[in-house]
């Protein structure tokens, strides 16, 4: 029995009979009823109001009466709350659904065909000057999982990665290796290549800071104030000058610099491959920034010739986005060098040439929300058919409890170290609980790997991607509660029961009888299993509009007739108020009279324009 099909077809029939109108299937929006209301599924009736010419409540009541009378085998009862029609599903219908799910190993999936849309998903995006870290773990797991979900929903999927393999940060590691490496390699050091290069990036930073301190002290003795002395020292330090000289040589294709760059990057790529393999993720196509940044300049120059962009007196090239409620965006500096936006345009151009993309999804942290708003507009202007509708799959930060698994720098946790620690914790916990009884050492190692990495993946993926999260290794490895190990253990127990039943000749029925008892938890599980196919069939899913959604903010600005340059966001929460303002291009003021404390600001990758103790300090400050 297909509950969703019967409800959708019955709603279409109801609108036809009650209001004499034909409606497409996609207009029937069903979602799971909120827990504080009675019912299992909720029908949104607002799309039908133009047809009924009645209030939302009256429209919902009329459709509800029709469904209860004409779809009684599925609808047991209904109630109406402010225009939302909450439907209670008949127990026999749930039993039928469970039988359908049990009989179909691919229930809810849609097969991929030649005509399926092609979706490209970008995730990971590492730099080749250091290993993958905790933030990459969340990014990789979200990107890989999203790819599996999109493919199960009938899309052709290309998983792609853009490697940031050029720039001053890469030259810093190269210069440090030349100065202090003594020819060290991954083989001679016994280190993974990405960790080895990361060590030299740290070494550069250490010596660079020492040079800055010496120069700063010298400039202050000469009468310069502290801030000016610091800035001059950063620019005049011999190491940073050498690094910039190396970057110029790289851009001019100096053979020695290019050979060193290729050798050290290859070490890093080998290290990345090991990390990706352990994590269980991969890619269909990898792009490299060193191959894409020049393409971006070409596309910008083409746009300039077509009048899509403009050049300022200093020779820099800009895009005017003020008619979009945004600002002007730099695309090429006055010296002709590109910025990140330009590089993303170049990467998009190469991808579009390589694949007939229908939809592009970028899995990138929420600090880049504004960047992708702009990129979407620019790609649309340049003629990319998917540009306007590109998806930025935005996610929040992930952190560890203080004092746990800090790296050498004390700030970033390496992905390799985290996974090794998870496997170690899984081994220890399983030993303590007696899970390894009568197992060989090889079996114990494999189960520890499966349980440890399963704990990591589930703990990260169970949290709403849009939210910041705290990853606690000890909680994730618990064999009780909402954890990966508990789910794995429960599955193993169920399989064990089924094996014992088969050994004792107990036959498990293929189907439940129509009168089989079913409890509320089972109904809730069945309801959740039903939601994905409903959303797939209708093209609609529950959507909640609120902070930090930039659409709400831009709509408000348009209604007020105010440009983003003339408005300011004032709030007491970094994760909603301030990020909402930043994503919309507003100046932001954080007041400390509410939720966020001053000490907590440094945890976020973005900063407010101004921090005040309270709203009483506002007069004269917000300009």
Residue ranges and their predicted role:
Residues 503, 521, 528-623:
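Asp-based, Mg2+/Mn2+-dependent phosphohydrolase catalytic module
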Residues 16-42, 55-529:
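NTP-dependent nucleotidyl-transfer catalytic core
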Residues 49, 361, 365, 393, ...:
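Short, flexible active-site loop motifs that bind/organize anionic cofactors or intermediates
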Residues 1-20:
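Generic start-of-chain signal for non-secretory N-termini
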Residues 11, 63, 348, 553-556, ...:
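Generic hydrophobic alpha-helical segments
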Residues 52:
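Phosphate-backbone binding interfaces of nucleic-acid-interacting proteins
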């Amino acid at each position: 029995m297909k509950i969703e099909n019967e409800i959708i077809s019955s709603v279409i029939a109801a609108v036809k009979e009650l209001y004499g109108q034909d409606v497409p299937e996609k207009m029937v929006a069903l979602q799971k009823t909120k827990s504080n209301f009675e019912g299992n599924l909720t029908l949104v009736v607002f799309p039908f109001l133009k047809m009924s010419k009645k209030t939302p409540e009256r429209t919902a009541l009329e459709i509800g009466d029709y469904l209860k009378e004409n779809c009684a085998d599925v609808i047991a009862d209904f109630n109406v709350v402010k225009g939302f029609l909450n439907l209670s599903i008949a127990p026999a219908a749930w039993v039928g659904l469970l039988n359908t799910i049990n009989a179909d190993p691919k229930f809810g999936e849609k097969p991929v065909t030649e005509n399926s849309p092609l979706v490209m998903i970008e995730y990971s995006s590492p730099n080749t000057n250091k290993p993958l870290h905790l933030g990459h773990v969340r990014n990789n797991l979200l990107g890989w999982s999203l790819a599996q979900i999109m493919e199960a929903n009938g899309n052709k999927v290309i998983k792609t990665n853009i490697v940031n393999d050029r720039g001053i940060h890469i030259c810093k590691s190269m210069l440090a290796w030349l100065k202090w490496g003594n020819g060290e390699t991954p083989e001679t050091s016994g280190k993974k290549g990405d960790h080895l290069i990361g060590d030299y990036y740290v070494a550069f930073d250490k010596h660079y800071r020492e040079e800055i301190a010496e120069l700063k002290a010298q400039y202050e003795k000469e009468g310069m104030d502290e801030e000016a002395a610091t800035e001059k020292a950063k620019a005049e330090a011999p190491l940073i000058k050498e690094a910039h000289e190396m970057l110029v040589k790289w851009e001019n294709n100096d053979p020695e610099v290019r050979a060193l760059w290729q050798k050290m990057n290859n070490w890093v790529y080998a290290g990345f491959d090991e990390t990706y393999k352990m994590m269980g993720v991969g890619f269909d196509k990898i792009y490299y920034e060193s191959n894409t940044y020049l393409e971006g300049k070409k596309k910008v120059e083409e746009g300039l010739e077509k009048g899509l962009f403009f050049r300022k007196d200093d020779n820099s090239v800009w895009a005017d986005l003020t008619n979009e409620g945004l600002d002007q965006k730099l695309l090429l500096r006055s010296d002709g060098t590109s910025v990140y936006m330009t590089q993303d345009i170049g990467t998009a151009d190469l991808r579009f040439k390589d694949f007939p993309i229908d939809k592009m999804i970028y899995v990138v942290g929420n600090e880049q929300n504004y960047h992708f708003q702009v990129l979407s507009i620019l790609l649309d202007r340049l003629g990319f058919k998917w540009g306007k509708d590109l998806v930025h799959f935005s996610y929040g930060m992930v952190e560890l409890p203080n004092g746990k698994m800090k790296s050498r720098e004390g700030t970033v946790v390496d992905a390799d170290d985290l996974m090794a620690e998870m496997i170690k914790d899984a081994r220890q916990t399983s030993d303590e609980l007696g899970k390894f009884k009568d197992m060989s050492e090889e079996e114990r190692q494999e189960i520890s790997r499966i349980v440890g990495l399963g704990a990591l993946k589930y703990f990260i993926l169970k949290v709403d991607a849009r939210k910041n999260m705290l990853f606690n290794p000890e909680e994730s490895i618990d064999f009780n509660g909402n954890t990966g190990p508990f789910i794995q253990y429960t599955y193993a127990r169920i399989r064990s029961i089924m094996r014992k039943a088969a050994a004792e000749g107990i036959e498990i029925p293929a189907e439940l009888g129509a009168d089989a008892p079913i409890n509320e938890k089972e109904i809730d599980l069945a309801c959740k299993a039903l939601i994905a196919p409903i959303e797939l069939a209708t093209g609609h899913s529950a959507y909640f509009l609120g902070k930090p959604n930039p659409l709400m903010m831009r709509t408000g600005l348009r209604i007020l007739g105010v440009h983003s340059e003339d408005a300011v966001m004032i709030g007491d929460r970094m994760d909603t108020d301030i990020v909402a303002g930043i994503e919309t291009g507003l100046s932001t003021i954080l007041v400390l009279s509410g939720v966020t404390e001053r000490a907590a600001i440094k945890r976020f990758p973005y900063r407010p324009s101004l921090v005040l103790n309270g709203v009483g300090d506002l007069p004269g400050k917000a300009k």
